[in-house]
């Protein structure tokens, strides 16, 4: 883990990378997750401390395990 980034920033960068690999906009991704687009943006910028329920929703939408979200 890089010392100069917070866990939220690392997680957000990982989510953004995986979303872009799917070719999804933030709006499409938010719809797939059942979350709001501005919330997804805040996650990707590392501004939110994401709940376990929302982590699960993100992993499910991306069709990956929760563990894979933390492979940064």
Regions found by a protein language model. Name each.
Residues 9, 20-21, 49:
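Short amphipathic helical patch at the helix-1/turn junction of helix-turn-helix
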């Amino acid at each position: 883990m890089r010392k100069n980034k917070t866990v939220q920033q690392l997680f957000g960068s990982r989510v953004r990378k995986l979303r872009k690999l799917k070719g999804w906009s933030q709006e499409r991704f938010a719809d797939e997750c059942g979350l709001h687009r501005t919330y997804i943006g805040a996650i990707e910028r590392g501004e939110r401390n994401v709940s376990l329920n929302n982590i699960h929703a993100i992993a499910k939408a991306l069709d990956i395990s929760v563990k894979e979200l933390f492979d940064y």
